Structures are given as structure tokens and as C-alpha cells.
């Protein structure tokens, strides 16, 4: 492939990702294909977002890292010291992508570190590695362009997460506001009793202890269930099993209790 063809292939990653869930594995595959190197896309917290290997490394520690999809904290933190692309780092470098315990097997191993930056902040790191042949200026151009595309997708994913969080919080607030005073009181007692995200509720016991009717409890649970905030399942004489579906619910409920 020519440099132009390789650039177009990276550009296609951005076009294909439009409106879809970000697939960092496919992005890593593309970068491995055009740069001809092992590719690791690592978040700022060391999570392995996606990777592709043209040369699999037979090392138990590396295999475990790939399985757990998590890079060591010390290594991840050290990457923040790399503020711009650092290329052709030898196996003796602290930033090497090759296992240092097997450095004698990878004496010709070379690593390139590309910071992923977007919106004025460090979003992660693109790590490339291969044996023998140096990363050329063309390779570095492709790597930095690839890092920019990955950064745009990380920002897009973060924006979607923020939007989803806001939507979840709004649903919870609407559901809680639909409750009457007595229903809200009943819900507070129910989740004090559960002391967690799920558990078994005996409505009659709570009704007797708090001094409210069982129908108030039933109505409150129905409102929350219809809003998709909780799921409830009758177990007959044993009671009702309740599970919280919206993670923001308990947070908002706690805020109300503290106000």
C-alpha cells in the first residue's frame, strides 16, 4: 500500500464509526495492518480499549494483561511523562511494550509511544511495537493520524456516556416526582430495609411498622417499575423481590433523605 492508501484506510475508520458504537478492536486491526506493528490502545487509566498483534508475544504476564484488558498502574502512570511521540524505543526503555523479563529474546524489539490527546486533555496512549525494522517517518505520520482518530472516538464515547448519565438521572427525578408524599415515604423505608440494590420485601411488615397502607407501597412500586427504575417480582407468601435497574435511583433517593 502507498502512504495515501494507508491514510485513506485510517480515514475510513472515522467514516465507518459515525453513528455507531466505537469498536477499538477494529481500529487496532486497521493500524496494525497499515503500520505493520503490534497495536495497543490504552486509556488514561490503563484499560486496554483494543489491541491487535501481527507478532503475538508468548509471555504469561503479557497474556494475562491482554486477558484482563488492563495494563499495570505503574507503567500506565509512566506514560504520562511522554508528552509527544517517542519512536524506536529499545527494549531497555521503561516504555518498552516487550516483556523485560524476556528482553534477551527481544533484543531488536522497538516500541513507539503516541500520546492520545483530545479536548485539551490526555485521553490515553497508542503503543506500537515490532521487531528489527525501525518506525519510519511515514509510520509515525500514520501513527499520529491514527492517534488523532482514536482520540476523536474516545471523546465521542465519553460524550455519549455523559448523555446517557444525564438521561438516567432525568428518568429517576421524574419517577420520584410522580410519587405522593406517603408513597415517597414508603419508598424510603423500603430501600432502608433492603440496604442495597436488590432484596426481598414483605410489604405488610413495612406497612405495619411505618403506619401506612399496603396499597401505598404497591402503588409506589408500580410507578417506579413503569418508569423502568426498578424491577419487581412477586414470590407469593415470601414477599416481593425488588431489583434496582437505574444506578442513579439510590443516589437521588439518598439526596432527598439528606435534604
Swiss-Prot record:
GO molecular function, one term: DNA-binding transcription factor activity
Record's protein name: Global transcriptional regulator CodY
Record-linked InterPro entries: CodY, GAF-like_dom_sf, GTP_trans_reg_CodY_C, Transc_reg_CodY_N, WH-like_DNA-bd_sf, WH_DNA-bd_sf
SUPFAM superfamilies the record matches: Winged helix' DNA-binding domain
Annotated HAMAP family: HTH_type_CodY (MF_00621)
Key words of the record: Cytoplasm, DNA-binding, Repressor, Transcription, Transcription regulation
Family designation: Belongs to the CodY family.
Domain of life: Bacteria
Function per UniProt: DNA-binding global transcriptional regulator which is involved in the adaptive response to starvation and acts by directly or indirectly controlling the expression of numerous genes in response to nutrient availability. During rapid exponential growth, CodY is highly active and represses genes whose products allow adaptation to nutrient depletion.
GO cellular component, one term: cytoplasm
Localization terms from the record: Cytoplasm
Positions of the UniProt region annotated as GAF domain: 1-155
Name of the gene encoding the protein in the UniProt record: codY
Residues of the DNA-binding region: 203-222
GO biological process: negative regulation of DNA-templated transcription
Amino acid at each position: 500500500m502507498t502512504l495515501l492508501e494507508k491514510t485513506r484506510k485510517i480515514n475510513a475508520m472515522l467514516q465507518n464509526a459515525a453513528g455507531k458504537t466505537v469498536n477499538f478492536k477494529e481500529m487496532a486491526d486497521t493500524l496494525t495492518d497499515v503500520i505493520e506493528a503490534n497495536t495497543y490502545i490504552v486509556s488514561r487509566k490503563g484499560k486496554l480499549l483494543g489491541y491487535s498483534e501481527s507478532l503475538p508475544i508468548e509471555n504469561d504476564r503479557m497474556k494475562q494483561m491482554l486477558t484482563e484488558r488492563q495494563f499495570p498502574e505503574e507503567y500506565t502512570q509512566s506514560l504520562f511523562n511522554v508528552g509527544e511521540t517517542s519512536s524506536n524505543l529499545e527494549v531497555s526503555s521503561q516504555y518498552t511494550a516487550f516483556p523485560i523479563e524476556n528482553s534477551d529474546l527481544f533484543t531488536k524489539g522497538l516500541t513507539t509511544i503516541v500520546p492520545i490527546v483530545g479536548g485539551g486533555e490526555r485521553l490515553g496512549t497508542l503503543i506500537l511495537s515490532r521487531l528489527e525494522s525501525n518506525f519510519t517517518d511515514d509510520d509515525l505520520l500514520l501513527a499520529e493520524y491514527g492517534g488523532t482518530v482514536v482520540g476523536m472516538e474516545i471523546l465521542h464515547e465519553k460524550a455519549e456516556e455523559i448523555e446517557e448519565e444525564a438521561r438516567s438521572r432525568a428518568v429517576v427525578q421524574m419517577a420520584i416526582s410522580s410519587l405522593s408524599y406517603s408513597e415517597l415515604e414508603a419508598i424510603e423505608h423500603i430501600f432502608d430495609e433492603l440496604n442495597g440494590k436488590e432484596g426481598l420485601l414483605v410489604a405488610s411488615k413495612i406497612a405495619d411498622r411505618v403506619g401506612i397502607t399496603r396499597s401505598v407501597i404497591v402503588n409506589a412500586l408500580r410507578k417506579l417499575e413503569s418508569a423502568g427504575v426498578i424491577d419487581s417480582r412477586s414470590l407469593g407468601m415470601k414477599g416481593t423481590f425488588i431489583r434496582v435497574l437505574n444506578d442513579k435511583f439510590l443516589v437521588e433517593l439518598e439526596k432527598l433523605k439528606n435534604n
